[in-house]
Amino acid sequence: MSSEDEDDKFLYSDEEDSNVVAKQEGPALKRQKVEETPKILAHDVPEGNTNEVESEASNQDSSSDEDDSSDSDSDVEIIIGTGNDTSKIDSGKSQISAITDTTPLGTADHAIAAVAGISDVVPVQEGSIPPEQQQQQQQTIDLNPDAQFDGKPIVQIDPEILKEKPWRQPGANISDYFNYGFNEQTWMEYLHRQEHLTKEYNPQKILMNLLALQQQGKLNDPGSGQPVQNTIQPPPPPMGLPPMFGGFPGFPFPGMMNNMQNQNVSSMNNMNNMNNMNNMNNINNNNNNNLNDKK
């Protein structure tokens, strides 16, 4: 034998021999124990109970065999795959997808009811909106608002009322307080003029004055050399019609317009007839002159 074999035998021979001896002695010891028990029982038990002793011995043999088989079977593990493997990620995804794919009937009914309820909404009528809300909706944005000072527009504040006048301090730049070249004096004049104009401005009054001037024929400039046209007053309206049926003052009644047009047409026809007569006279004179020349 080589030195390596001797070393292996020296290292592992005792363990292998002990394992072999243990395997050989194990079943022999069990048989000896099983064989000794019925002998002991045979001496102590009377002859009439020998069947019971034998049955007990057979039960013990079967139990020992079952123990041996259970010990041998305990080392074997059998795994049967009956479901999804929870140790894998795909199984979790499949479970989640299976849960999300199914929709409960309650939610579907609720969604159908919500869609059906859309047609039941009644549109809001214009008259049902309160006037305050209508005013808020109609409000527009002022792009050029007046500046505010203490909650009042700056054009309504008199500079003389202010306690502090920083523009009067020495070294102050007046353009920081007055724009567009104003100073304190000119700003006061501007405010008084604006107040006077707002009081006198009345669009209805201005329109009535213009209509009166048009009716009197004073709208044309007398220095321009154009003659002032005398407006013809319209006749009174027929019975049962409002007084303004003919139009605004200074304009003729609708029936008079047709008469004026007819008069203009007839005058134009007369002018054409007169021109034709003159042409005929000229032709006759020319013919007479030609005859005299021949003679």
UniProtKB/Swiss-Prot annotation:
Q: Where in the cell is it found?
A: Nucleus
| Biological process terms in GO annotation | mRNA processing
Q: What is its main location?
A: nucleus
Q: Which GO terms describe its cellular component?
A: mRNA cleavage and polyadenylation specificity factor complex
**Which InterPro entries does this chain map to?**
Fip1_dom (IPR007854), Pre-mRNA_3'-end_processing_reg (IPR051187)
In terms of superkingdom, the source organism counts as Eukaryota
Q: Where is the composition biased (Polar residues)?
A: 48-60
Q: Where is the composition biased (Acidic residues)?
A: 1-18, 63-76
Spans through the membrane:
none
Keyword annotations from UniProtKB, A to Z: mRNA processing, Nucleus
Region named Disordered: 1-93
- Coiled-coil portions: none
One Pfam family assigned to this protein is Fip1
Per the record, where are the segments of Basic and acidic residues compositional bias?
32-46
The UniProt function text for this chain reads: Pre-mRNA polyadenylation factor that directly interacts with poly(A) polymerase.
* Similarity comment: family membership: Belongs to the FIP1 family.
Protein name, entry field = Pre-mRNA polyadenylation factor FIP1
In the UniProt record, what gene is named as encoding this protein? Answer: FIP1
